[in-house]
């Protein structure tokens, strides 16, 4: 895709759930108006990009209500038609109704939600009753034709029960996307739930094994992305690419930020959609310069790393969270990324080069088939799925 562009729309930072490790909700947060949506469209008319993806995030985006999306989706779809807009949403599904589901289905909005495994694990991390409320919303979304995938947040506590969590996703037939609990720029105790990088790396290797063992019955999106990174030598999701200048978030009042993770923190405001800032103006703001400084830091600090092309130092937010807000290192999960990249790379090498050829006769050698699916089998599966 040429010149991809991602705009995260944060209708509100409010959220009815009380996840214990959450850093992106804010009580009493205002809700975005349709007028602000129109301002977003007008702002984007001055942005030269061929495609754009809009992700409704939060907080909890469904708090904006059915009327908001009934108006916002056609305004964006028609106003940004030249950019061929796609849509997505990240929601806990508590406020999903048949009415909202029909509105979202009309615009083919895929849903990302959050379940941390079996009910007791989920509720211990996200609050009593979370699991049942989300599953109720999931049923409504599914029955109205919406595609739903789940993010599973692994904390330093739940990672100890990884086998139960994988078994849950396998039995439910859910596509799994892993998210490690992260330190936060907003928290007074940022590491209370955070998964340590070394443990995260070992978890990724475990999930690689599980994805390959259950290759025909389970999909783990992170493993797909990581294998694609190593195989193509290019990052395929925002964590492993230079996101600065191609990803922005718009808060409820129209303020523009480098990413949804910064929304609500005034020191990271880059501009406002009402002022129609150019990309150059946004990147010249203090927070824009900070993002570019991270890119420059990675070029120097990671210049000799063989994974730099498809890692790019990881996530800038993760890098700034421990300091806080200063660039003094790369993403702390560097240890985990190296661990899984090395593991995938070594398995690819073994699969492609280590096995001696078998003689098929007529001078035609054939590679010996592995006894169980490997990384190449996963790459073939992804290629067939498009």
What are these language model-derived features?
Residues 2-35:
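Canonical Radical SAM [4Fe-4S] cluster-binding loop centered on the CxxxCxxC motif
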Residues 10, 128-135, 139-244, 249, ...:
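Radical SAM enzyme [4Fe-4S]-AdoMet core and its adjacent flexible, acidic
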Residues 11-15, 60, 91-95, 117, ...:
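Short, flexible loop/turn elements at secondary-structure junctions
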Residues 11-18, 60-63, 302-304, 308-309:
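Cysteine-centered iron-sulfur cluster-binding motifs in ferredoxin-type domains/subunits
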Residues 41-55, 64-185, 192-195:
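Radical SAM/AdoMet-radical enzyme domain recognition
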Residues 263-386:
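Flexible mid-to-C-terminal extensions adjoining Fe-S/redox cofactors in radical SAM and related proteins
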